[in-house]
């Protein structure tokens, strides 16, 4: 059997002959790692920045990406942005979150800095995302036990022993009253 081209929204397609009269077709779709809003539509993109789906219903567990102006959001075409460097960092953050099996509700780009929102915690990653920074999240989030605030990973390095966490003011007042 010959090979043809695969549609951009598919990761892999395999066709097998099961018997002389039947075939098995297996299709693996590209998984979205984030989405942006385009009016009332949710525009989902994969780890390469390719728009893999557009719809009016949100998919649970995929983070909203805010703060980047995108020129075009056409289905099966790459997202184009003037801020390609920071967009690359956002894609990297999405990939690393997926590897760590973490779900961020939102990824925000503000003044060339990246922020993740995981539950009640805002994680400040700075201008560059590294796998080491994201790898710190699971144990830290477990220790925070639902506290609200900002976790500062923008200056994190492997030889750093402490990572600053600013408790949200309302949470701090409640704990002082008790």
What would you call each of these model-derived segments?
Residues 25-106:
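Extracytoplasmic segments of membrane-associated envelope/inner-membrane machinery
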Residues 3-31, 50:
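Membrane-embedded segments
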């Amino acid at each position: 059997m010959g090979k043809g081209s695969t549609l951009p929204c598919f990761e892999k397609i395999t066709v097998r002959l099961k018997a002389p009269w039947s075939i098995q077709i297996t299709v693996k779709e590209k998984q979205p790692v984030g989405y942006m809003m385009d009016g009332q539509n949710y525009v989902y993109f994969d780890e390469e920045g390719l728009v893999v789906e557009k719809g009016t219903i949100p998919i649970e567990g995929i983070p909203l990406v805010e703060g980047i102006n995108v020129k075009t959001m056409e289905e099966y075409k790459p997202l184009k942005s003037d801020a390609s460097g920071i967009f690359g960092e956002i894609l990297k953050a999405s990939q690393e979150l997926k590897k760590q099996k973490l779900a961020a509700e939102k990824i925000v780009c503000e003044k060339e800095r990246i922020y993740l929102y995981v539950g009640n915690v805002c994680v400040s990653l700075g201008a560059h995302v590294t796998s080491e920074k994201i790898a710190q999240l699971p144990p830290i989030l477990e220790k925070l036990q639902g506290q609200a605030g900002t976790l500062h990973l923008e200056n994190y390095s492997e030889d750093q022993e402490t990572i600053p966490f600013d408790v949200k003011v309302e949470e701090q007042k409640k704990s002082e009253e008790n």
